[in-house]
A protein has these predicted regions:
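Hydrophobic beta-strand residues in large extracellular and virion-surface proteins
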Residues: 58-60, 118, 146
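Active-site rim helix/loop that mediates acceptor-substrate recognition in acyltransferases
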Residues: 34-57
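Short glycine-aromatic motifs
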Residues: 55, 132-135, 139
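Conserved catalytic-core motifs of GNAT/GCN5-like acyltransferases
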Residues: 136-149
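Conserved donor-binding loop and adjoining core beta-sheet/short helix segment
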Residues: 51-95
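Acyl-donor binding region in acyl/amide transferases
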Residues: 82-133
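Short amphipathic alpha-helix that is part of the acyltransferase structural core
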Residues: 1-41
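Short, flexible, glycine/charge-rich loop motifs used to bind or transfer phosphoryl groups or to couple energy/partner
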Residues: 47-48, 76-77, 108
Length: 150
Protein backbone atom coordinates (compact mmCIF):
# COMPACT_ATOMS: atom_id res chain seq x y z
CA UNK A 1 0.00 0.00 0.00
CA UNK A 2 3.01 2.31 0.23
CA UNK A 3 2.76 3.12 -3.46
CA UNK A 4 -0.36 5.25 -2.93
CA UNK A 5 -0.68 8.73 -1.43
CA UNK A 6 -3.84 10.49 -0.35
CA UNK A 7 -4.59 14.19 -0.43
CA UNK A 8 -7.32 16.65 0.46
CA UNK A 9 -7.77 18.84 -2.62
CA UNK A 10 -8.03 22.52 -1.75
CA UNK A 11 -10.76 24.56 -3.48
CA UNK A 12 -8.13 26.64 -5.31
CA UNK A 13 -6.73 23.46 -6.90
CA UNK A 14 -9.98 21.86 -8.11
CA UNK A 15 -9.62 23.31 -11.62
CA UNK A 16 -6.17 21.73 -12.00
CA UNK A 17 -7.42 18.17 -11.68
CA UNK A 18 -11.07 18.53 -12.69
CA UNK A 19 -10.66 16.81 -16.06
CA UNK A 20 -9.31 13.74 -14.24
CA UNK A 21 -11.78 13.80 -11.35
CA UNK A 22 -15.05 14.54 -13.15
CA UNK A 23 -15.20 11.16 -14.98
CA UNK A 24 -14.64 9.34 -11.68
CA UNK A 25 -17.45 11.30 -10.04
CA UNK A 26 -19.70 10.49 -13.00
CA UNK A 27 -18.77 6.80 -12.73
CA UNK A 28 -19.83 6.89 -9.09
CA UNK A 29 -23.08 8.64 -9.96
CA UNK A 30 -23.76 6.06 -12.67
CA UNK A 31 -23.91 3.33 -10.02
CA UNK A 32 -26.91 5.01 -8.38
CA UNK A 33 -30.33 3.72 -9.40
CA UNK A 34 -32.23 5.87 -11.88
CA UNK A 35 -34.97 6.62 -9.36
CA UNK A 36 -32.45 7.94 -6.84
CA UNK A 37 -30.61 10.02 -9.45
CA UNK A 38 -33.58 12.36 -9.76
CA UNK A 39 -32.70 13.93 -6.43
CA UNK A 40 -28.94 13.44 -6.56
CA UNK A 41 -26.17 15.89 -7.29
CA UNK A 42 -24.48 16.24 -10.68
CA UNK A 43 -20.77 16.67 -11.31
CA UNK A 44 -21.35 20.42 -11.72
CA UNK A 45 -23.09 20.51 -8.33
CA UNK A 46 -20.10 18.85 -6.72
CA UNK A 47 -17.68 21.27 -8.36
CA UNK A 48 -19.65 24.22 -6.99
CA UNK A 49 -19.73 22.60 -3.54
CA UNK A 50 -15.95 22.09 -3.61
CA UNK A 51 -15.37 25.75 -4.46
CA UNK A 52 -17.80 26.86 -1.74
CA UNK A 53 -16.16 24.43 0.74
CA UNK A 54 -19.52 22.76 1.32
CA UNK A 55 -17.95 19.43 0.33
CA UNK A 56 -14.45 18.04 0.44
CA UNK A 57 -12.63 16.14 -2.29
CA UNK A 58 -10.03 13.54 -1.35
CA UNK A 59 -7.88 11.83 -3.95
CA UNK A 60 -5.53 8.86 -3.85
CA UNK A 61 -2.78 8.80 -6.47
CA UNK A 62 -0.37 6.05 -7.46
CA UNK A 63 3.40 6.39 -7.84
CA UNK A 64 2.87 7.84 -11.34
CA UNK A 65 0.47 10.46 -9.85
CA UNK A 66 -2.52 8.93 -11.63
CA UNK A 67 -5.71 9.44 -9.62
CA UNK A 68 -6.90 5.96 -8.61
CA UNK A 69 -9.62 6.70 -6.07
CA UNK A 70 -11.67 9.68 -4.96
CA UNK A 71 -13.81 10.31 -1.94
CA UNK A 72 -16.28 13.12 -1.42
CA UNK A 73 -17.51 14.14 1.99
CA UNK A 74 -19.44 16.83 3.78
CA UNK A 75 -19.45 17.78 7.44
CA UNK A 76 -22.82 17.44 9.12
CA UNK A 77 -23.63 19.38 12.25
CA UNK A 78 -25.83 17.38 14.60
CA UNK A 79 -27.64 19.34 17.29
CA UNK A 80 -25.15 22.17 16.65
CA UNK A 81 -22.61 20.53 18.95
CA UNK A 82 -21.49 17.35 17.21
CA UNK A 83 -19.70 17.18 13.88
CA UNK A 84 -19.90 14.08 11.70
CA UNK A 85 -18.04 13.55 8.44
CA UNK A 86 -20.48 12.07 5.93
CA UNK A 87 -18.74 10.20 3.11
CA UNK A 88 -21.16 10.76 0.26
CA UNK A 89 -19.35 9.27 -2.74
CA UNK A 90 -16.37 6.98 -3.32
CA UNK A 91 -15.30 6.11 -6.86
CA UNK A 92 -12.28 4.86 -8.73
CA UNK A 93 -10.67 1.81 -10.17
CA UNK A 94 -8.65 0.49 -7.26
CA UNK A 95 -10.66 0.50 -4.03
CA UNK A 96 -9.20 -2.83 -2.92
CA UNK A 97 -5.60 -1.63 -2.95
CA UNK A 98 -5.86 2.01 -1.91
CA UNK A 99 -8.90 2.31 0.39
CA UNK A 100 -6.62 2.50 3.44
CA UNK A 101 -4.93 5.64 2.12
CA UNK A 102 -8.32 7.25 1.45
CA UNK A 103 -9.36 6.36 4.99
CA UNK A 104 -6.17 7.87 6.42
CA UNK A 105 -6.50 11.23 4.69
CA UNK A 106 -10.25 11.54 5.33
CA UNK A 107 -9.92 10.54 8.97
CA UNK A 108 -7.07 13.01 9.56
CA UNK A 109 -9.23 15.77 8.04
CA UNK A 110 -12.23 14.77 10.15
CA UNK A 111 -10.19 14.90 13.35
CA UNK A 112 -8.74 18.32 12.46
CA UNK A 113 -12.28 19.61 11.92
CA UNK A 114 -13.49 18.27 15.27
CA UNK A 115 -15.64 15.46 13.89
CA UNK A 116 -16.46 12.68 16.33
CA UNK A 117 -17.59 10.12 13.74
CA UNK A 118 -17.44 9.22 10.07
CA UNK A 119 -20.51 7.78 8.36
CA UNK A 120 -21.02 6.35 4.89
CA UNK A 121 -23.58 4.49 2.88
CA UNK A 122 -21.88 2.09 0.50
CA UNK A 123 -22.17 -1.10 -1.45
CA UNK A 124 -22.19 -4.38 0.47
CA UNK A 125 -18.98 -5.41 -1.26
CA UNK A 126 -17.15 -2.63 0.59
CA UNK A 127 -17.98 -4.10 3.99
CA UNK A 128 -14.96 -6.44 4.41
CA UNK A 129 -12.46 -3.68 3.62
CA UNK A 130 -14.25 -1.18 5.85
CA UNK A 131 -14.47 -3.63 8.75
CA UNK A 132 -10.69 -4.14 8.66
CA UNK A 133 -10.34 -0.38 9.23
CA UNK A 134 -12.67 -0.29 12.24
CA UNK A 135 -15.99 0.55 10.57
CA UNK A 136 -19.12 -1.03 12.03
CA UNK A 137 -22.52 -1.54 10.50
CA UNK A 138 -25.25 0.39 12.26
CA UNK A 139 -28.35 -1.68 12.82
CA UNK A 140 -31.44 -0.31 14.48
CA UNK A 141 -34.90 -1.81 14.69
CA UNK A 142 -36.74 1.43 14.13
CA UNK A 143 -34.80 2.97 11.27
CA UNK A 144 -35.99 3.00 7.70
CA UNK A 145 -34.99 5.06 4.70
CA UNK A 146 -37.93 6.30 2.70
CA UNK A 147 -38.32 8.53 -0.33
CA UNK A 148 -41.30 10.15 -1.99
CA UNK A 149 -41.11 11.82 -5.38
CA UNK A 150 -43.05 15.05 -5.58
Amino acid sequence: MGEYRGFLVLPKDIHRIWDHVEPLIQDGLDTISENDKLSYLTTDDYRAWFHDTMAQLFIVVDKDTKIRLIGISEIGYHAERTRVLHCILIAGDNFKDCHQELQNVAEAFAKREGCVRMVLTGRKGMRPALETMGWQEIKTKHRIIMMKDL
